[in-house]
Amino acid sequence: MITRLKKLPFKLPLVLVAIILGSISMLSFKAAKFRSDPYMVQIPGGSFYMGPSDEQVDMAMVNRKKLVSITGFWMDRTEVTNQQYRKFVKYVSDSLKYLAVYAGGVNQTEDTVKVDWNRALRINTNSKAVIEKLNELLLSPDNRIQGKVEIDPTKLIYRYSYVDLKAAAKSSKGLEQPLSNFLVSQTEAVYPDSLVWMRDFSYSYNEPFTRLYFSHPSYNHYPVVGVTWKQAIAFCHWRTNNSNFYLDKGNKKDEKIDGIYRLPTEAEWEYAARGNSKTNNMYPWGSPYTRTKEGRLLANFKPGRGDYFGSDAKNDNIYTSKVQSYPENAYKLFDMAGNVAEWTSSVYYEGGNNFIGDFSPDLQ
């Protein structure tokens, strides 16, 4: 399954870049009796020309088009929203509070201490005794605004581990070695960088977005921004575990996902963005034009210098737009061009299309 996470909070000039969380082959889903997430759509396998579009002659000098085949997967219909990502942040916050109050410290992991969520969600943070135990999670007194006691966002650390299958595959005796030899442990601060609004827009008044964009409910259905690649990976890991936790809790173990949520590869993202188009057009809607016949913009981007409206009276998306604000593509995916940049699992390498494989290609 694939989750789409956003990297930057600004409009791009129709750049096809994405963050997708976790793809699973369709065969795996059937074997697991998987109930598809209502926010996801099934992308059928197929072949397409990966690389520059026909109109991008200058790009052909760097990355040539290459015919590749992609196996089927599921993908989020929209970018991951502020509301969805806040659930991840709240999970980390609540679990750390539980470890601090009931397990003797936040450095414990859920591998050794299981969080009792009935108790975790009832922790009284107004109690002086509780505040004393939470001290290692709180802002230091000299960093508090008007003396308000709050959680330090930099201390919201998510700890997880995974098996490095690539490392195991490189070893000639990978199957004979203990699993611990290939077990990788990671820690990642999960709170997004809200200062990206200030950093990416020089000489521009964006303080309100820095203060409110991630936390205010008015932006619930806007794409989360300021998320690093490592934070996106951590979110994918949490989403997999969280989904399986609720299936376990509901005694639906036979429906657990036979796979993981993850970021998409660049090839998967581009294949999904093109929306089954055979014309190799530049844009996901299958034409070389950026407007409808009525003059409406087909994506959230900057039409011209100093012009964020594009003479479109109904376009009020000066910055990011709410998910599903623009038409979906043939695969029923939204914002596969414009709005904000998205992460993939692949590493960018100039000329990479010249040597990647032609079956589910990836470069890491």
Where are these regions (language model features)?
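A short glycine-rich, aromatic-capped structural motif
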Residues: F34-F214, N220-T240, G338
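Sterically constrained small-residue positions within well-ordered secondary structures
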Residues: L8, P13, A31-F34, M59-M61, ...
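Functional-site microenvironments in short loops/helix caps that host divalent-cation chemistry
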Residues: K30, Q42-I43, Y49, D54, ...
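Intrinsic disorder/low-complexity segments enriched in polar/small residues
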Residues: K7-L8, L12, K133, G295-L297
